Amino acid sequence: MLRRKAIPENLRSPLDGLRAVVAEVEAARAAMTATVPSTRLPGTPLAEAIAEFEAHLTGARDLMPRWRAPEVEEEWLGCEAGIEESLERARRLREDPPELGGFEGLIWVVDQVLAPLEAFEAAAERFRTLRR
């Protein structure tokens, strides 16, 4: 039987903190991707989605100190920068919305706002490498 490697005791609390932050980040992502219409739903209005996105990312930013630890400092800094950049892109989109020109433009804008949050994948991978 294969056993999953355990996270070191000193990283359990930071890992729980990361999970709490990721829950907010995922809710923010879901808010933005909900703007894209599907065959069954028209898509959330962009202004409404941006407000929800910013609220969830602000919540994520407030939770960030919970997972800061020397072993994951580089990843923590990357995630902090990713949140700040995504919030800045959302602010610019809210204050000066571009002409989207249809479905492709909307997809591009959503991708641009979400791209900095890819840093969280590196953080999750770092925690996986720290298991013993």
Segments from the language model and where they lie:
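Long, low-complexity or tandemly repetitive, helically biased scaffold regions used
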Residues: 1-132
